């Protein structure tokens, strides 16, 4: 058969040539006459075999080549006619995905014999016919055309073929046209350093290539340098792609970027330590290469140390094969394996890709797992699930317990009892304090309370010339009115004073467990003050009473501040006009928080006992004329004033439990007086207080509070004044008590005097050293109305409160006997 006939047969015109041998052949484009089936290698090859009446090669019809996308050819035993049909069918293939052409046997001579004709090729017997130029040239052209045109091709393996000189360049040009290749192998093809350079220059731009096999290709250190250049270019390209994907703060998955993953350079003994140096320098900063095969590459301990240095920086490499390198010691080989964490081959388990299985979101994506890893992961998930179940059960129990506590009706009572038992005095609940506030009212109405209060009268003395002593006990007239208006109350069994003190002691022990040291310090200070004072020491009942009053004292929510002191300049000219005053914390708190004005404060009632506290003093004359104190003279003589001159009222004890009364109470008293009673001592006392408080002062200075000096004046410095009020003076119900005021428990002074059972009251007034005027001149005649008191104070008679009390008791007994 001539060459022209073979050419025509390749182009599909064999039938026309047979029918018209003497006619001129007109070439037609192959796509016009070829069907879709002819573009597949397998269909095209079977058509050609049928046309030539030849039996197909058994290897193509085997199970390995059963699919139309896979082709594996072994060219050792194929004849010339078989190669002609195979090359023609492969030349136009567009379906194959894997193409493998290999020689099973390796021959020492890899050159191509210059046999260019079919006749001479059929007579070639020394080696397989593929080593002839006629067959090998047509095969390379068919492979190159298939690689460049078939975009479905992903695997190309040309193993053991004599790809030398221009043949490898033809394959390399075809590789550049196909960007879908993932695996390229030239194993045992003996391409040399020149062929390696050509292939590497093409493969470094293939972004999808993953496996590049140059094993047994006769490479040297120069070829290793070309491989290093290919790896470097691949690294730069992938870093660029990773940077593009990391824009807008996105995370980059290294596995999603394509490129080389496996480089196989085994059985190239000429590479040596010099070639491995090029490769390790590039791999130090690479993050994509997973496997390097340098088996039998003539490496020594120097190359092994270079590999260890590379592995210290590169953690992406999972396998670095250095077997069959006689120059590397076993210790360094073991070190490389330990650094990689590789398991022995016999202990390695197969890995499975479970990404396609639904319901396994907890497993890492795009990663194969072994059975042992899957079991350990399952065990960890079970432990986590059991822990979550335990937490859920505990939460349900706690929720149920809290709901039961909230539904119980006595839950609030239990909380209050716990607060009363465990809390300190500052942390007592409001209910507990409110219960203690009820106790003073019960105790005040008892006879034992009045008897114990009289013991304090003996050692008491009036310390202020402005305020008279008042008691908080309801008067007899008030009690009679309440009994008339209201039904008889239930009988209350009052405890004795000793039992009440015991109960209060028990409460105080429970509350004051944390303040025992402070109480000891206070007792020492009290003992020191008692030793310095001239008054007689209090008895045991009085000390119990003070403790009782401290417990009964109502706790005001007052913000504690530091004591502020007004300082004045050391100017002798202005020293008489300016005062150095110090205010206590309670005074500042009352002024700022409660807005109390202490400019004019006084008591409104006199109780049915004759108790005089050092913080109280009553001033008034009996009869028509009242005792008037010269306040202007006192202000001129004494630049430093005491606190009681400006209306501070102190109750029983130290006075911290009593409120300060506002000056508006004076106006209320004056407005509620009956017309005819204005000449009484209360009306004159009120008018004197208003005039003296506002005399010579402007708006702000009138209401400016003054601190009080807690000074006690002994009984010897007091003089007595006898006051009397006409029993015929009748007051209205509004004059007797201020029922709409905040002090309903107090009664006016006229309530006591209007009763026929009581006589005149003796009042103690403090004697001042600065008084230059005679008290008798200011008092005038005090016997108006036939009172028992005398207005003559010239003798400065000093009486004892005990005598007053005894006289009152005798008078009371006489009236009862009468």
Swiss-Prot record:
Residues 782-792 have a biased composition (Gly residues). It is found in: Cytoplasm, Cytoskeleton, Microtubule organizing center, Centrosome; Cytoplasm, Cytoskeleton, Microtubule organizing center, Centrosome, Centriole; Cytoplasm, Cytoskeleton, Cilium basal body. Residues 513-589, 691-748, 768-798 are annotated as: Disordered. Residues 514-539 have a biased composition (Acidic residues). One of its GO terms (biological process) is cilium organization. One of its GO terms (cellular component) is cytoplasm. Disulfide bonds: none annotated. Keywords: Cell projection, Cilium, Cilium biogenesis/degradation, Cytoplasm, Cytoskeleton. Residues 561-589 have a biased composition (Basic and acidic residues). Gene3D superfamilies: Ribonuclease Inhibitor. Belongs to the CEP78 family. May play a role in cilium biogenesis. This is Protein Cep78 homolog. It comes from Drosophila melanogaster.
